[in-house]
Amino acid sequence: MKPFLRWCFVATALTLAGCSNSAWRKSEVLAVPLQPTLQQEVILARMEQILASRALTDDERAQLLYERGVLYDSLGLRALARNDFSQALAIRPDMPEVFNYLGIYLTQAGNFDAAYEAFDSVLELDPTYNYAHLNRGIALYYGGRDKLAQDDLLAFYQDDPNDPYRSLWLYLVEQKLNEKQAKEALKARFEKSDKEQWGWNIVEFYLGDISEATLMERLKADATDNTSLAEHLSETNFYLGKYYLSLGDLDSATALFKLAVANNVHNFVEHRYALLELSLLGQDQDDLAESDQQ
């Protein structure tokens, strides 16, 4: 190719790439990242005052530490949450909800064997604690134990077939086992559902029934305020990231996982595992390493 023609080709390619990136940014739906509320700050201050009091029984102290840990977790303060959960467990080692949170943190840190043990403890203490099946299933999924993950996530799905996110996680696992059968099973679950929750729109996208543009238009139309918009975006961007990851489009997947995290919906499963996905993609997660790998 002659130098002049080569230059024209490169210039045209750069121009088209710039237009494509610009169009992507203009069409992107964004929310204001969630921030701590005054009510949450007041509750934390009040909890601190009560915990400083000596007029608490052991059971009361353990419960309050757990509740403060949950609040810390919802604000993204995982190191403080883990500290409260550990203190609660030292006082009362029979709290399944505490083992559940610790198992989630261990999964996020990639410490899967310890996570399995934590979720096993949850179900030993309370066999009806169904979310342990979700969280253990996710840990097994990331740990590469796909058949066991399918068993847990199928049990979780069967408890509420109208919850779209149960179908989505089950599909992500079954996709690794047999992609064609997984798609057929997802379609069957979609058709049997009441389709009332927002997440079924994501399922429709996965099935190829709607485009990504239609999905995002429905998202904007469904959101009633900034909080619901941020929550829907955290969910949708995570599952879009998983979709593009399955296609081998690592750049789009990485961008979408970052967008899922950017909304600060810290207590959503999609936010938690978008961080893990970024870690697996080689993105630096210094806070994750420092707080969880102990």
Swiss-Prot record:
GO cellular component: plasma membrane
Positions where lipid (S-diacylglycerol cysteine) attaches: C19
InterPro entries per UniProt: Lipoprotein_NlpI (IPR023605), TPR-like_helical_dom_sf (IPR011990), TPR_rpt (IPR019734), Ycf3 (IPR050498)
Protein's GO biological process: cell division
Repeat positions for TPR: 62-95, 96-129, 234-267
Superkingdom of the source species: Bacteria
Compartments, record wording: Cell membrane
Membrane topology recorded in Swiss-Prot or TrEMBL: Lipid-anchor
Keyword annotations: Cell cycle, Cell division, Cell membrane, Lipoprotein, Membrane, Palmitate, Repeat, Signal, TPR repeat
A Pfam family reported for this protein in Swiss-Prot or TrEMBL: TPR_16
PROSITE patterns for the chain: PROKAR_LIPOPROTEIN, TPR, TPR_REGION
Residues annotated as signal peptide: 1-18
Lipid attachment, kind N-palmitoyl cysteine: C19
Assembly: Homodimer.
Protein purpose: May be involved in cell division. May play a role in bacterial septation or regulation of cell wall degradation during cell division.
Protein name in UniProt: Lipoprotein NlpI
Lineage: Bacteria, Pseudomonadati, Pseudomonadota, Gammaproteobacteria, Enterobacterales
